[in-house]
Every structure is written in structure tokens, then in C-alpha cells.
Amino acid sequence: GADFYSWG
């Protein structure tokens, strides 16, 4: 998901 650490 579009998180601070995970964009995938």
C-alpha cells in the first residue's frame, strides 16, 4: 500500500 515505508 501507499505507506511511508511501503509503496508497492
UniProtKB/Swiss-Prot annotation:
The keyword Transport does not apply. One of its GO terms (cellular component) is extracellular region. It is found in: Secreted. This cephalomyotropic peptide stimulates contractile activity of cockroach protodeum (hindgut). Its main location: secreted. The lineage of its organism: Eukaryota, Metazoa, Ecdysozoa, Arthropoda, Hexapoda. The modification Glycine amide is found at G8. It comes from the Eukaryota. Keywords: Amidation, Neuropeptide, Secreted. Transmembrane segments: none annotated. One of its GO terms (biological process) is neuropeptide signaling pathway. This is Leucokinin-8.
